[in-house]
């Protein structure tokens, strides 16, 4: 597993990994994700940190509270799934970068 690995460079490698993680976290925060439900009657936008940035509800839903709640939950869950998938993808890319540093 550590064949050919130079342990004397471990401190610098850890520092590099921390920098890369911080950079990826910043990039993720700046990403925006969106989801719609009910054929676009409800739309939700979130950033890469999972913070909801905007919710749009079509006026036709204002009289139907139950439908609005169902569609809101659906759109919010979908946008949060997108954020989580992006986080997993980012972590996977970062772990792939470790292999290029000599950790196999």
UniProtKB/Swiss-Prot annotation:
Q: Where is the composition biased (Basic and acidic residues)?
A: 16-34
Known Pfam families for this protein?
A: YbaB_DNA_bd
Q: Where are the transmembrane segments?
A: none
Q: Using the UniProt annotation, give all residue ranges assigned to the region (Disordered).
A: 16-38
GO MF terms held by the record: DNA binding
- Which UniProt keywords are listed? Cytoplasm, DNA-binding
Q: Where in the cell is it found?
A: Cytoplasm, Nucleoid
Q: Which residues form the signal peptide?
A: none
- Which cellular component terms (GO) are annotated to the entry? bacterial nucleoid; cytosol
Provide the primary localization: cytoplasm
The superkingdom listed in its UniProt entry is: Bacteria
Among Gene3D superfamilies, the record links this protein to: Nucleoid-associated protein YbaB-like domain (3.30.1310.10)
As for what it does, the entry says: Binds to DNA and alters its conformation. May be involved in regulation of gene expression, nucleoid organization and DNA protection.
| PANTHER family, per database record | NUCLEOID-ASSOCIATED PROTEIN YBAB
Q: How does it assemble?
A: Homodimer.
Name the NCBIfam families on file. DNA_YbaB_EbfC (TIGR00103)
The UniProt entry's sequence similarity note says: Belongs to the YbaB/EbfC family.
Recorded protein name is Nucleoid-associated protein Ccon26_18480
Species assigned in the record:
Campylobacter concisus (strain 13826)
